[in-house]
């Protein structure tokens, strides 16, 4: 930081409301810094609070504000650090917060917790923490991101499933191996290399190597991958199918040693949803921020596909268990720190009444998730026989309002 003669004579407070989190435009952060510097050219500045909510269970390769993914949190912190380091009048900064902490009034992905920490409640190291450690630590270091994501799933048309893996290091390039095979050499940008890694079904060992100031650095992680076929011509996976609706998020469930995958549209011979739109709350943010009662797996129920016509899976003949997950969604009350996330008009989607028909048989009649309570997890388990090549065809027939589905699981008996 450049020294300014009058830096500590007069304190100045600047309105920074976590641009890119509570405010939608992340680039407004550096615009405000430059604007303040133009008004106070002889004084240095400190950014005393910034952060984004991160749930270590949630991941997305299409990260967006308020999805609580590790990937959006990393994107946010990389941007802030880069922009502050560009400006010699920024004397320092303070991340909000070192670790997650309890906050009773909050909903979000982890209710009653402020998840802006770069460490979890259990002090697990989120990707943002590893990034700062590699960029600001005294000793040369390299860290592979996604350390918390032990159980993963990915759709593929081959025996391999490619997934981007971040590597953090103060070097120009990184060599990455998977299962002792060279994946490639990847260039870094802002201290992050994104390696496209080919995973196989089962346990995979990923290793990364680089050189920092003449010192060799490396790291390794173990990933348990379930490669889910895009079609079931060769059989249905014994580990089943677990799909969340209305988002591009993955959610790891360590208790069940599995990973929920994001939805995809149905293709002939494969599986997926038919019709509908993604539920977005006022302010165009993903899903709801309400505390979902009756579960600790809130992210599964906080997103939703509305006006869905069907979910189809062209599975082999046999007996299957279909588990449908629903929640009647309504926005949580607007909080003073997050007014921009709520529009003037509240959405009320509690009037959603419909029938569910599976392979021509009505299994739920005049179903309304709101009958069980608003923002409450509702689970319906159905046994069905797929025969004569018909596969599984779950139809949602509207009676009043919109049909909807939050998540679906399919197992073969």
Residue ranges and their predicted role:
Residues 6-7, 48, 96, 168-170, ...:
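Generic beta-strand/beta-sheet core signal
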Residues 1-124, 128, 132, 141, ...:
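Substrate-binding/catalytic cleft of secreted carbohydrate-active enzymes
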Residues 9-11, 52-53, 100, 125, ...:
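Short, glycine-/Ser/Thr-/acidic-enriched flexible segments
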Residues 228-413:
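Compositionally biased, intrinsically disordered or flexible polar/acidic segments
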Residues 33-35, 80-83, 151-154, 162-165, ...:
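Generic recognition of flexible, low-complexity loop/linker segments
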Residues 12, 184, 190, 364-366, ...:
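A short acidic/small-residue loop/turn micro-motif
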Residues 38-40, 87-88, 158-160, 168-170, ...:
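A structural signal for short secondary-structure junctions
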Residues 83-239:
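Carbohydrate-binding surfaces of carbohydrate-active enzymes
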């Amino acid at each position: 930081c450049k020294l300014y003669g009058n830096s500590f004579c007069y304190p100045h407070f600047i309105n920074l409301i976590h641009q890119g989190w509570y405010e939608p435009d992340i680039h407004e952060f550096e615009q405000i810094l430059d604007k303040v510097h133009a008004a106070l050219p002889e004084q240095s500045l400190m950014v005393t609070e910034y952060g984004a909510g991160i749930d270590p269970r949630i991941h997305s390769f299409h990260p967006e504000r308020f999805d609580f993914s590790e990937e959006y949190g990393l994107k946010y912190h990389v941007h802030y650090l880069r922009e502050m380091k560009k400006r010699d009048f920024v004397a320092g900064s303070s991340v909000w917060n070192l670790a997650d902490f309890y906050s009773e009034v909050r909903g979000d992905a982890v209710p009653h917790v402020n998840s802006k920490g770069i460490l979890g409640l259990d002090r697990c190291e989120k990707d943002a923490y590893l990034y700062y450690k590699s960029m600001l630590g005294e000793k040369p270091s390299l860290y592979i991101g996604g350390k918390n994501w032990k159980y993963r799933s990915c759709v593929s048309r081959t025996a391999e499933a490619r997934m981007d893996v971040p590597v953090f290091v103060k070097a120009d390039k990184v060599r990455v191996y998977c299962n002792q095979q060279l994946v490639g050499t990847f260039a870094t940008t802002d201290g992050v290399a994104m390696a496209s890694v080919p995973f196989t079904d089962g346990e995979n060992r990923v290793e990364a190597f680089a050189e920092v100031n003449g010192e060799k650095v490396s790291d390794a992680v173990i990933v348990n991958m379930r490669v889910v076929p895009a079609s079931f011509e060769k059989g249905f996976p014994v580990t089943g199918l677990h799909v969340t609706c209305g988002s591009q998020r993955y959610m790891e469930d360590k208790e069940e040693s599995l990973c929920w995958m994001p939805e995809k549209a149905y293709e002939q011979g494969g599986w997926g949803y038919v019709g509908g739109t993604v539920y977005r709350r006022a302010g165009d943010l993903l899903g709801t921020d309400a505390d979902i009662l009756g579960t600790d797996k809130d992210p599964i129920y906080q997103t939703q596909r509305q006006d869905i016509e069907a979910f189809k899976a062209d599975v082999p003949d046999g007996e299957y268990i279909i588990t449908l997950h629903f929640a009647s969604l309504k926005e949580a009350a607007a909080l003073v720190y997050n007014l921009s996330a709520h529009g003037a008009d509240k959405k009320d989607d509690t009037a959603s009444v419909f029938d569910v028909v599976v392979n021509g048989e009505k299994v739920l009649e005049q179903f309304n998730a709101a009958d069980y309570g608003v923002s409450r997890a509702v689970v319906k388990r159905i046994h069905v026989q797929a025969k004569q090549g018909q596969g599984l065809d779950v139809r949602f027939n509207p009676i009043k309002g919109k049909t909807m589905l939050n998540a679906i699981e399919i197992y073969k008996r």
